[in-house]
Amino acid sequence: MAEETGQSKLAAAKKKFKEYWQRNRPGVPAAAKRNTKANGSSPETAASGGCHSSEASSSASSSLHARQSPCQEQAAVLNSRSIKISRLNDTIKSLKQQKKQVEHQLEEEKKANNEKQKAERELEGQIQRLNTEKKKLNTDLYHMKHSLRYFEEESKDLAGRLQRSSQRIGELEWSLCAVAATQKKKPDGFSSRSKALLKRQLEQSIREQILLKGHVTQLKESLKEVQLERDQYAEQIKGERAQWQQRMRKMSQEVCTLKEEKKHDTHRVEELERSLSRLKNQMAEPLPPDAPAVSSEVELQDLRKELERVAGELQAQVENNQCISLLNRGQKERLREQEERLQEQQERLREREKRLQQLAEPQSDLEELKHENKSALQLEQQVKELQEKLGQVMETLTSAEKEPEAAVPASGTGGESSGLMDLLEEKADLREHVEKLELGFIQYRRERCHQKVHRLLTEPGDSAKDASPGGGHHQAGPGQGGEEGEAAGAAGDGVAACGSYSEGHGKFLAAARNPAAEPSPGAPAPQELGAADKHGDLCEASLTNSVEPAQGEAREGSSQDNPTAQPVLQLLGEMQDHQEHPGLGSNCCVPCFCWAWLPRRRR
């Protein structure tokens, strides 16, 4: 609009100038004609006019020269103004082009910023997903720890049962001696009852053996499952570590690209500031002293307004760039924090791998328990052989008791007495051998218990605040205590097992070393049988405090006939149970595998 108005004004001025020039250029004849027309009806007036024509022509020429000089000046001024207006139009066009370029650059920068924000949001979403996966892995590792501790406790229970079985074997040795002495005096009716009780106890022992076999198979299957899960978790951790490394590399590359873009933006802002300074300098240049026209002043005001607006837009762009730089700084700080968190997570993953390696140690403990079970079975076989030998010795003694008169030698011969002495010496040697085996087994079990307790107490991250001789059988549940309480409970179980085992074998050795029960080497056969009866009474007194009475009708009949029959028969049933399934106790304990799988069902 401003250009059109300026051009229209210039065209109108040119037309006026041409009309004025045409009017003033042929001015002399036209004026003469007008004067002659005004005065020329009479010849007198014409003569008088001819006299004054020379004076009029001179005055007209002088007035024409005076009028032509300002017209030429006005034409020059108009030409200069037209040149200035064309220059201003050119500057306006260039400024408009610069404005369009700046707007285009602003749009491109806005698009780039939007893309950066989208990328940052995607990265934040990926980080949140990784955090959730990490939490899931933590929960799975927690449940794995609890299940492994539960299996450790079960292995300790099995070790305690082995100790009880060895203790019962020692008690059964002495109870067999008492049974051999007491069965001679019992009628045949009691033998039928004892057979019925033995059958019942055999059936119970067979059932318990089946249950224990199922329990052992379940334990083996659960151990296999735990090992497979551990391998799967290790593979998952390796894959996630590789993913984390790839993502860290991508993040570092994106940070480098952001830095380069920031540098490019700063250079662009500097260039824009330079262009602004140049435009301001051009605007600040002084105009020529010629007074511009009204239209040029209006156009200059419009140009100044446009320049101010462009300057405001550039300032806004500079402010936006500053805000973007601040946001980039904040993003860099966040990226640094995320890198630190990732490093911490990597360290935690390494610690978890170490803990998984530590959790693999219970497998070696189970293998050691298997070796211990094998050694205990070997000891039991040796004890059985010794029992058989003792039975043979007892048979020889009973045969010697039945025929005492026929076996009495003459006063000058000592063959039979020497045979009895040999038998008694063999019996004493066998007892000493049994005692040595029992002492070696006790020392071995004590050392193993102390090693396990020391290992549990010296584990990293655990404490033994609640360890006491009576605190045992802590179940590995997710809501009962924690790692410290479980380790302390396990230590207490080990201490309690060692204490009970040592107490039982102490009683056994005290009964074995009782001088009242040992026969003298030179005593005859009836005195030896009396000592055996006394020793049977001692065994009965020690067994009645530790063994519960039987149930049913056999309880009443046996208690009326003989008070020693009840514990002896029960011990015989348990011995048969040990022979069928050696290495395990008599108490059947079917475990509950709920703690290791409850959290999965809840999920």
UniProtKB/Swiss-Prot annotation:
InterPro entries xref list: GM130_C, GOLGA_cons_dom, Golgin_A
Superkingdom to which the source organism belongs: Eukaryota
Coiled-coil boundaries: 82-173, 212-440
GO CC terms in record: cis-Golgi network; cytosol; Golgi apparatus; Golgi cis cisterna; Golgi cisterna membrane
Compositional bias (Polar residues): 69-82
Expression (tissue specificity): Highly expressed in brain, heart and kidney. Detected at lower levels in liver, thymus, spleen, lung and peripheral blood leukocytes.
Region (Golgi-targeting domain): 491-603
Function: May be involved in maintaining Golgi structure.
UniProt protein name: Golgin subfamily A member 8B
UniProt source species: Homo sapiens (Human)
Name of the gene encoding the protein in the UniProt record: GOLGA8B
